[in-house]
Swiss-Prot record:
Pathway: Amino-acid biosynthesis; L-lysine biosynthesis via DAP pathway; (S)-tetrahydrodipicolinate from L-aspartate: step 3/4. The record marks 56, 119 as: Part of a proton relay during catalysis. Its main location: cytoplasm. This is 4-hydroxy-tetrahydrodipicolinate synthase. One of its GO terms (cellular component) is cytosol. It catalyses: L-aspartate 4-semialdehyde + pyruvate = (2S,4S)-4-hydroxy-2,3,4,5-tetrahydrodipicolinate + H2O + H(+). The lineage of its organism: Bacteria, Pseudomonadati, Pseudomonadota, Betaproteobacteria, Burkholderiales. GO terms for biological process: diaminopimelate biosynthetic process; lysine biosynthetic process via diaminopimelate. Keywords: Amino-acid biosynthesis, Cytoplasm, Diaminopimelate biosynthesis, Lyase, Lysine biosynthesis, Schiff base. The gene is dapA. It comes from Polynucleobacter asymbioticus (strain DSM 18221 / CIP 109841 / QLW-P1DMWA-1).
Length: 307
């Protein structure tokens, strides 16, 4: 596939399987930085093509600004240039997003992930102005993040096409879960001449199909527990190997579904703890996985040969 997003400066290619990594915590809710370092090394060894830190799966709403910055710093330090680091620095305050993005740039992140502002429900023009301001304020590549199931505000395809023309905005994580919307967006971007703008899936169930239709990778929850398989899935789908894509997708489909039997990242953190990869902590208002759902999740992991 020739269309690849690149981070400015380092020119690292941003594509393929990028886990939206969890934030390891001790049972008292304090952050487990040694555990994070070990988890990052595991992802590199298992073939992950990039790391997204402090996103939805990383419990970004419940870490302090100081913790947010330290998570980015530790991740960049531990990865040490081996794969791209995409820092979740978005929010519903434009100025705060700019400040966090400045920090990410300073410590060496390769790009930023900027969520559609939530709660304050901006108009399409407000979204455009918000993302444009961030891109103009910090010399760090911006990946847009549309996840209307969480933000309520939903960025229209026309707005994405407009933003694709803003220097520094290099792609979007489309977490609408709509294959129709994703493929139409890819087509609209091509028709508008934005051939270097990347569309990443943010929905594991539909990611394989979106990549077969021209998507450039997957910012994934499932990749937290199956990094090698998700890397192989992205390679297969992006090289039009339909047979191998289908094989891996069916191996993982129960896991894709199980990752959302309760609100993300509750199931994925429980799964990683069960796999021996992280400590057991999670922060309120999120709570540990309901006991009645543990066996079904364990069964999905076993079905995919992850346990």
């Amino acid at each position: 596939m020739t269309n690849k997003a690149h981070s400015q400066g380092s020119k690292k290619t941003i594509q393929g399987s990028m886990p939206a990594i969890v934030t390891p915590m001790f049972e008292d809710g304090s952050l487990d930085y040694p555990g994070l370092r070990a988890l990052l090394d595991w992802h590199v060894s298992e073939g992950s093509d990039g790391i997204v830190i402090v996103g939805t799966s990383g419990e970004s709403p419940t870490v302090s600004v100081e913790e947010h910055c330290e998570l980015i710093r530790v991740t960049v330090e531990q990865i040490a240039g081996r794969i791209p680091v995409i820092a979740g620095t978005g929010g519903n305050s434009t100025q705060e997003a700019i400040e966090l993005t400045h920090f990410a740039k300073k410590v060496g992140a390769d790009a930023s992930l900027q969520v559609v502002p939530y709660y304050n429900k901006p108009t399409q023009e407000g979204m455009y102005a918000h993302f444009k301001k961030i891109a103009e304020s910090v010399d760090l590549p911006v990946i847009l993040y549309n996840v209307p199931g969480r933000t309520v505000a939903d960025m229209a395809g026309d707005t994405v096409v407009r933003l694709a023309g803003v220097p520094g905005i290099i792609g979007i994580k489309d977490a609408t879960g709509s294959l129709e919307r994703g493929t139409l967006l890819i087509n609209d971007l091509k028709r508008a001449g934005h051939h270097e703008f990347s569309v990443f899936s943010g929905d594991d169930l539909t990611a394989a199909m979106l990549m077969l239709m021209g998507g450039h990778g997957n910012i994934s929850v499932t990749a937290n527990v199956a990094p090698r398989l998700m890397h192989e899935l992205c390679v297969a789908a992006m090289s039009d190997d339909v047979k191998r894509t289908r094989e891996i997708q069916y191996q993982l489909i129960a896991v894709h579904k199980a990752m959302f039997i309760e609100a993300n990242p509750i199931p994925v953190k429980w799964a990683l703890h069960e796999m021996g990869k992280i400590t057991a902590g999670i922060r309120l208002p999120l709570t540990p996985l309901s006991s009645s759902l543990r066996e079904p999740l364990k069964a999905a992991l076993k079905q995919a040969n992850l346990l």
